[in-house]
Amino acid sequence: MRVVGLSEDDGGPGPTRVFAHRLVHGTDPAVVAHDAGWTVVKPLTATREEDGEIVLTLLVRPLDGERRPHEPGRGRDAGLELPPGAEPEVRQRVAAYAVVLSERGLLATEYSDRTAVPGRWGMPGGGIDDGEQPADAVLREVGEETDQTVVLDELVSVQTSHWVGRSPRGTLEDFQAVRLVYRATCPEPREPRVLDVGGTTESARWVPLAEWPTLSWTHNWEQLLGSLLP
């Protein structure tokens, strides 16, 4: 993934590109911006270029005393035991998710026992296939995990996590998740059902907005929803 910063602070007729850097494994895009002398105002777009690389474009402004964003470091799956001399496979995975609202509330998905957080809840979405645009990926994933048709809105957040654990296939990985999070609406909500049976999604449901804090969310999703929802 490549991270590009655009600034409107030069007085020109439109945003100016002020940096473009590759996202080093384990690093957050906000740290990339800070180390280049900028702070993130908001994410703008995420697109796959002709060379196959995903480019994340951020609106930024010059640093004005902001501290370097905190990076929690590399975690580890609970209960994971590393054999002596084990070398995890380094993997950076870019995925796309949607915070979907409808007249029935918030669309939520429950993680299956193929994940490290079975029984916890998150947003529908998942990995971006080779050659696929992030916006197309999130529409596909929402359909596979919930059987809903949604209308995508703006990119609202970029989250990263970094840990050592085992993939659903059992591979030991030094894994960085980069999550592109969009807003979306569902004009014609129906009863959710998981079409991709046997994957990382156990179930899906509509949650009335007043009740969303009662679910057992993963930490990252709970934090994000607290900033986006009433």
Residue map of PLM features:
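The catalytic Nudix box helix
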Residues: R22-V41, M123-V156
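N-terminal strand-loop-strand
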Residues: M1-V18, L82-G122, V150-E154, C186
